[in-house]
Design a protein with these regions (language model features):
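Active-site-adjacent loops and short helices of periplasmic peptidoglycan-processing enzymes
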Residues: 1-89, 93-102
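Domain-terminus/edge residues, biased toward the C-terminal soluble/receptor-binding domains
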Residues: 69, 80-85, 89-305
Length: 305
């Protein structure tokens, strides 16, 4: 990545990039995550999208995909902007999504890192601003943030006995202590419960036009939800089938989704797959289907000429 003048002269925290310097994308990511380098964040944005503005659009699109629906990003560094905002819940959704990326998980858990420094015989020594990596043994990662407008902000994650939680505090003077208390509360007072198991048949669809007569809906992957210790599990299951679903269906085809929610809030989902083949119940219908497909394919060929 070649560092632009705009990136090199970013205000706020910095890893002291120089205009024209060349540095790897991975080193820049360490600079962003460990040292809160605003210059590194802009260099990444310009490398990926060509401009901060275009990168912010990608940020907003990805945020919505993670479930962060009440955020709007205008820059990659978090510097104040009237139209740049987020919520604690949204930050938790983004962190949960990011932790699934192995590269991100490795970087955010790193305490110290030396990255390249072009033109010098030594590298840049980075120390993670996230003190929880030293204070709280179960910490798996996190990101600090501070501006006068936002105050002290912290997103952090911790894992214990196979369960991982994310805690977020915004404008919080006692961020280190409060996040530790939140993570203790989440790890000690909640448990993970399996709602459906992989391979479970959760419903049968009657299909009179088929030879088999019915189609079993199988769960592709298990779905877990988190509930309070001692609490009862009351969730809503919603089956959403593909609108274009038609015969024939092959065993193993993805035919829809199962969504698990509570009080309108999505807790988890998984694909539904066909548990059996589903074929036409007569030679005539099979022939009609073959002719229809042949006609469609011929039309595509004519349209493409």
């Amino acid at each position: 990545v070649k560092v632009s003048r705009k990136a090199a002269y970013q205000e706020g925290s910095s890893i002291y990039l120089q205009e024209g310097e060349r540095i790897s994308l991975e080193d820049l990511l360490y600079g962003v995550m460990l040292a809160s380098g605003n210059d590194a964040a802009v260099a990444v944005a310009e490398h990926i999208s060509g401009s901060v503005e275009e990168f912010a659009e990608l940020m907003n699109k990805k945020a919505r995909e993670t479930g962060a629906l009440n955020s709007n990003f205008r820059n990659p560094s978090g510097l104040p902007d009237p139209e740049h905002y987020s919520t604690a819940y949204d930050q938790a959704m983004i962190m949960r999504y990011a932790l699934k990326n192995k590269i991100f998980a490795r970087i955010t858990a790193t305490k110290n890192k030396t990255i390249s420094w072009e033109g010098n015989d030594w590298g840049r020594g980075l120390r993670n601003h996230n003190k929880l990596l030293w204070l709280y043994p179960d910490t798996t990662g996190g990101k600090t943030g501070y501006t006068r407008a936002a105050g002290r902000c912290l997103v952090a994650s911790a894992k214990r006995n196979g369960r991982e939680v994310v805690a977020v505090v915004l404008n919080c003077p006692d961020d280190w202590l409060d996040v530790q208390n939140l993570m203790d509360y989440g790890l000690d007072n909640f448990k993970e419960v399996k709602v459906v198991e992989k391979g479970d048949i959760i419903y049968w669809i009657d299909w009179k036009e088929s030879r088999e007569g019915s189609l079993g809906l199988l769960v592709e992957n298990p779905v877990y939800v988190v509930i309070p210790v001692g609490g009862k599990l009351k969730v809503t299951r919603e089956i959403i089938l593909k609108p274009e679903l038609e015969l024939p269906v092959k065993k193993g085809d993805i035919i829809g989704q199962l969504k698990i929610s509570k009080d309108g809030r999505l807790l988890g989902d998984t694909n539904l797959i066909a548990g059996n083949d589903l074929n036409y119940n007569s030679i005539f219908l099979r022939f009609l289907h073959w002719v229809t497909n042949l006609t469609k394919n011929r039309k595509k060929g004519i349209d493409g000429e």
